[in-house]
């Protein structure tokens, strides 16, 4: 039987690997759904086989610090919604002269379902997931333009915004553990799937998404983060993040 289908221990030391286009995409997930999806990706590693994976409540509980009964309830409750979840790929990215990555506004926008089918087994305390054929090229056998991090880095996070920011930082982190990311406010909001009220009010965006996410990554995943809001006139139009691993940290 494939390792994807058997019970293992904690998944926290396994890697999450995905194409950069997927990292930037709107993923359409709440925190529990994101935990399930990326646990599945981490468990499969590079052994996708038929695109099927089983997640056991014991694995999920050990990974995210939950009681087994609570873990299975969370798995079963959320997996039922994941059959219809999808990610959104914007038109081809482009880079402006100031180095800011900006998404194209013309061209096809694709909405791609994560899973072809889902299942659950009350007796064995597990769920089953089968990825769609369209998503596998963004997760499997990647040679370039990909984001990689250990699931452990996200296990303690309590905000999906923090997790999204972690992924975007990892996409732009160099071999020395340092990096920077400049992005338009519009594209940042798209990647973070910010509500309309925050898109229209930078003060709310900063206080309810940006700063809490920065604070959580500093506290729980050992980052040093600098942040700048860049204005044109009186309006904030771009963001710049500078980040590196805290040399005093011992997470790994």
Residue ranges and their predicted role:
Residues 1-252:
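Charged, alpha-helix-forming regions
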